[in-house]
A protein has these predicted regions:
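Short surface loop/edge beta-strand patches of beta-sandwich-type extracellular domains
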Residues: 168
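Functional-site microenvironments in short loops/helix caps that host divalent-cation chemistry
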Residues: 1-165
């Protein structure tokens, strides 16, 4: 709760609808990863080591078992927007604090990204995002949406540029 804190606990549908209202869209998973990496090839956009000054994650003040006890980012829960330095593209808060939804569906069964176009893959079943009604139900293997970036209550490993989470 606070004007400078990120919006949290938003469904994928609400995030998509907000973007549509603003005449925008959620980024694809490929677009998000390109943006967060900021032109780097390291584990995290700032390098390969975490000191606690790069983003908000489950650190020494976190009460969960997955905490990283050796570092502190200075926040027990969410941090005010802009509390950490930007990535090389000048983008703030791309990792940690709260997860970020992307457009893609997760295809567990077929491992879409092994067979997808290498440049700008659209993600499996993008047509489902503009369709409504029972005939639009995804296949058994495509039932999850993807979020990226990690959050204040996630391990530091989830801040990796390549990490992905999924939810129904």
């Amino acid at each position: 709760v606070g004007a400078d804190l990120p919006v949290d606990s938003v469904s994928w549908e609400s995030a998509r609808d907000y973007c549509k209202k603003m005449e925008l869209r959620l980024p694809s998973e490929a677009e998000w990863e390109y943006s967060v990496r900021g032109g780097t090839k390291t584990t995290f956009y700032w390098g390969n080591k975490v000191t606690g000054r790069e983003g908000n994650f489950c650190d020494s003040t976190c009460e969960l078992n997955l905490r990283e006890p050796r570092v502190s980012d200075g926040f027990k829960h969410t941090a005010p927007v802009g509390s950490f330095p930007p990535n090389p593209f000048g983008l703030y808060d791309m990792v940690g604090n709260v997860n970020e939804w992307v457009q893609d569906w997760l295809d567990i069964e077929k491992n879409y990204y092994l067979v997808s176009p290498k440049q700008d893959p659209p993600g499996p079943r993008p047509e489902l995002d503009t369709c409504s009604g029972p005939h639009c139900a995804p296949s058994q293997s495509i039932t999850h949406k993807i979020s990226r970036g990690g959050a204040w209550n996630h391990s530091v490993a989830e801040m990796r540029s390549a990490n992905r989470r999924y939810a129904h």
